[in-house]
Amino acid sequence: MLRGTTKLQKACWAAFLLYLIALLYYTIFAESLGRRGAGDGAEARYNLVLFNEILRFWVYRDKLGMRAFVLNVVGNIVAFIPSGFLLPAISRRCRRLPGIVLVGLSISFLIECTQLVFRVGSFDVDDLLLNTIGVILGFFINRFLRRWRWKRQMAKEQRKIKIREIDT
């Protein structure tokens, strides 16, 4: 599986696996986030109307608290930034925007389906949208940092060339 990979790719694989474990914990098992198992008599909850839950959290932010709104909206985005950041380093498919969107959306969809089947949290199309936005942000952060590093390396090479020209 990891034959022929660089140390950076191996480190990214390890980081991605740790990230997935943490993501699964918070999206499936974290009781502090209101996760209840099917044994608690919970009904399967779902939202298939885009922006419905986001709007509901905004409208009732005075009753639910601004923390609930931020946790739902910003939390769903931030939770998927690492996947958009790490996946391009470990998968060639994820080095272009369509590939990373497809993989990120698939991961999010699997988590939402797991929540529906085991009746923890809820299946929410708003979460799919917000998670995908997070993946895209992570992808562009990765791309920005790679270009920045490349430009730094090129500038360093240019300085070396100028020093060699001066020495000769």
What are these regions (language model features)?
Residues 1-120, 125, 139-168:
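Bulky hydrophobic segments
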